[in-house]
């Protein structure tokens, strides 16, 4: 599934469009937004200039697109374009597609159900924070205790929930040693608040749980 931006010259006055692949088969898509804007054009044919365009942002349900690969699609004029997505209404922190179901508890605990095998994986994801006075080649902890995300309160927020993409953010404010004292080979007694965010997402027809963090 791809998130794409399509610019169509305003002078073409499209009421809508369809998208097909190289074989001429229709490709499913959903419209996220539409706006009239301007685009700088630099071309040996059209010369540099500014064009008024209708800009469409959409989810394209493209399958079989490999990493670092290119795949072409054709846009054709149509009588109408599908309606825009409705605003987010679902607030329950559960994500589900045909392959997996992901549940996030109020405490930030993450459980994943594999629908194919009917196996439930419980508490699958956490943040580990530890001391490290090694170098670029090795990690060295010196036996000091770890700090775990589960030991700190979690704020859970549903970011997106629709037929194409679902996303949940887990935020924790972890209180950890402010720095490492290399002269004493131990962590400082002074504490600092470290805000950690995990963003979980799934996509239509995809058996993977995508994880981002800051």
What is each residue range found by the language model?
Residues 1-214:
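Catalytic and substrate-binding regions of extracellular carbohydrate-active enzymes
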